Amino acid sequence: MAIYELGGVAPRLDASAWVADSAQVIGNVTLAADTSVWFGVVVRGDTDHIAIGRGTNVQDGSVLHADAGVPLNVGQNVTIGHKVMLHGCTIGDESLIGIGAIVLNGAKIGKNCLVGAGALVTEGKEFPDGSMIIGSPAKAVRQLSPEQIEGLRRSARHYIENARHFQAGLKKIG
């Protein structure tokens, strides 16, 4: 893993957080307990704070960044899919951000939300708890069912277990 201090500010990682070797975590970043940052991810806290909550997973190829005065806050047990771009936004607990989605500065995603694959959440847009959010520009199309919300929770739990599997068994052979 590549963990970088920048301007005297080093990332703060809980001992149970797992960061893949090819991921980069830079500057003013906090990773809470049971977080996982997967291969090829960049979490760059150079202009403002980035906080990633307990049990959250940031999947392969994603980029997390913030602008000055616009921190990035990700709640607990959030699943951030492959190649997601999060920039200066707020993501509520137990939400799922689908593959390739983009969430821009000042946007707020409520708790228990599903942002569909490829969605573009524009600057300052806010969505209430339990929303299914799709499209470009993104719109809330309906509320999630209790079964769908449980599926979001299962995804986060799976990645906590998968990170433990990688911590215990990943061995570089070449």
PLM features per residue range, with description:
Residues 1-13, 18, 46-49, 54, ...:
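Glycine-rich hexapeptide-repeat left-handed beta-helix
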Residues 23:
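Compact, Lys/Arg-rich rRNA/RNP-binding cores from ribosome-related proteins
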Residues 26-32:
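N-terminal glycine-rich anion-binding loops that anchor highly charged ligand groups
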Residues 34-35, 52:
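Short Gly/aromatic-enriched secondary-structure transition segments
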